Amino acid sequence: MTEEHVVLLDEQDKPSGTLEKYAAHTLNTPLHLAFSCWLFNEDGQLLVTRRSLSKKAWPGVWTNSVCGHPQQGETTEEAIIRRCRFELGVEITDLTPVYPHFSYRATDPNGIVENEVCPVFAARATSVLQVNSEEVMDYQWSEFKSVWQSLLATPWAFSPWMVMQASDEQARKRLLNYCQR
């Protein structure tokens, strides 16, 4: 895969430039565009992934299925499809926004900051996973309600963006409705 960049955003969340992804994520990460996707199988189970230990931010932490950054000139939907293929080796369908205006800023235990405008989507897996171990060290298909209970009981074991996304009542209802269809 070619070197990835993040699309930097100004105070009005408008693109203002790009920066190499690894260089962007520091103790003072600039605001940039991202996405988050919750992937479900045909049985309505959610794919929860554990981030590789080689990840710069939140290594080894459990999170939602796939996250990433649209590249300049790429739609969010195109970026989600690209990252699902790269990280999980999976094809997807029925890509649906569930929390289109999510944004957050969080600092990991090593001081690395995430500072993202991060629309959240749900999608359905249509092929068998072929996980990229450089991105994902473990994964689990689980019932959404069980994951929600785990997020409530042990939020520290999950990425802060996953906890924040699921804690939004409207987003949680949309995810629950999505997994039940």
UniProtKB/Swiss-Prot annotation:
Listed Pfam families: NUDIX
TM stretches of this protein: none
Active-site residues per Swiss-Prot or TrEMBL entry: 67, 116
Similarity annotation: Belongs to the IPP isomerase type 1 family.
Species this protein is from: Salmonella typhi
Keyword Hydrolase appears in the UniProt entry: no
Pathway assigned in UniProt: Isoprenoid biosynthesis; dimethylallyl diphosphate biosynthesis; dimethylallyl diphosphate from isopentenyl diphosphate: step 1/1
Top-level EC class: isomerase
Binding locations of Mn(2+): 25, 32, 69, 114, 116
Domain Nudix hydrolase intervals: 30-164
Entry cofactors: Mg(2+); Mn(2+)
Complexes and interactors: Homodimer.
Gene Ontology terms for molecular function: isopentenyl-diphosphate delta-isomerase activity; metal ion binding
EC number: 5.3.3.2
Protein name per its UniProtKB record: Isopentenyl-diphosphate Delta-isomerase
Principal place of residence: cytoplasm
Residues that, per the record, bind Mg(2+): 67, 87
Top-level taxonomic group: Bacteria
